[in-house]
């Protein structure tokens, strides 16, 4: 106890095994011999009472006494060597004098000193604490800078992560007249168009979460949160035939989607082009034209541009020798009912199937047209009476499927030569979005979603060249039956419309998954060439800041526009034919029916029997193992 003093630093061992320094604040002598120590821990001060034995054990450097002098040590350690009994007898007889042997002094080993280890551990903890504080300071500084870059934006963190993500993308977008490549025209084409933000959305500081790095790919940045509430981006990548950004006009969209189908109908085929997407995503704008005011202008819609190209193609060689006439019809499908938009009063029509299994819309008018101006008049008449309503997503939402058909007939016998169906589908809706709407609006949404589901199944069956098409599932597919049946004479183009807003990200993903599902099951698709979504899984703010600038973004490939699809499809067809051949029932073996044949067979030589057996085995293998 004499070597200890108040405010002296000593090492102590905690109950969990930790060893650190503590300060003596009280010494109790007598029988108890307790030492009271305390030490700071975080924002508090802790204390403990220790017996003297533990203090001595943990601090041997304090209680080590100085070594004795050499003479005393030598005298203390000198001992007489004890001889064995024979040795004692020899000493007693005087034959051997006693010899004092000095034992070598024992080496005193100092207890291990833990001072260096504890000091290093404390230094390491201090450095880690400083690094954490520096990282927290940098994070606070980054947050302040992010707020200052986009003041007043409640989603500034998401906006910054998306901005940093887009800086790593190389943009190569579709532009009208800037490419010399051949426009792909497959049996099923799927294109996506992203609409720009509206003025109201810009005023509300809506965030654009859709990026288009190339003319075939797009990425949807979905904001998510970890368990610890740290925000991050989950990037969903898609690949289609063509992707149009918000700067593309209707003319550019038409050039890559519907225009390649004009030549197909003049060659005697059936073509279908339809716009699909969430309500308010721009389907009617794309198909019908702009809205300069309350009324729609049909001058720059796909309807009018297709009609203009039809009349211009009609005058070119060799189609001018076919002597074709152009007819137009315009009708809508509201729920399960069909209405003619070109007749006064918009009468309801019946959809029936004749004896030739051809679906006929009874009473539908097909007006003959001579030029584009007459087509525009019909479009304005039909758009003025089309059914629309108010929803939570769009103040003027189309509640029906509008079908505008351009029909080519021969002038001699009025025989159908080709048909082009341009469809403005009603917007798909979720039940959670219109749960507060009235019963009629919910029923409309239910019928719309049902018809869109059947439409997708018909397109998938068309892509698989299936013998069964579920076109009777809805009035829409029933009316368009001749646009799905016909093999290579039928071509379809789908324009998926998406909204870039943050609050519509779920609708956008549903639309893109719908379109991708249609595309990936087509005949010419190449599933084996799907590339992995490298560096596109999920990205947090810290990951984006630390990422290298050489990060690449290559989304999945599930498109029929990729090269080599035809060979893959041919190989698939050959394999299917081989399987069909192998599954054909083999012919029954023939047996001799008369005794004469049995005698003849018994009388044949062994060589002939062996040859017959070999031939039979070869025929069996040829039938079952081509």
From Swiss-Prot:
Superkingdom field: Eukaryota
Gene inactivation effect: Defects in chromosome segregation, but does not affect the mitotic spindle.
Example GO molecular function: microtubule binding
Domain Kinesin motor span(s) in chain numbering: 187-521
Extent of Basic and acidic residues compositional bias: 113-150
One example of a Gene Ontology biological process annotation: chromosome segregation
Bias (Polar residues): 72-96
Native organism taxonomy: Eukaryota, Metazoa, Ecdysozoa, Arthropoda, Hexapoda
Keyword ATP-binding: yes
Functional note: Required during anaphase to drive sister chromatid separation to actively depolymerize kinetochore microtubules at their kinetochore-associated plus ends, thereby contributing to chromatid mobility through a 'Pac-man' mechanism.
Organism: Drosophila melanogaster
Gene: Klp59C
GO cellular component, one term: kinetochore
InterPro entries referenced in this protein's UniProt entry, alphabetically: KIF2A-like_N (IPR054473), Kinesin-like_fam (IPR027640), Kinesin_motor_CS (IPR019821), Kinesin_motor_dom (IPR001752), Kinesin_motor_dom_sf (IPR036961), P-loop_NTPase (IPR027417)
Residues binding ATP, per UniProt: 277-284
Keyword Nucleotide-binding tagged: yes
Protein name (Swiss-Prot/TrEMBL): Kinesin-like protein Klp59C
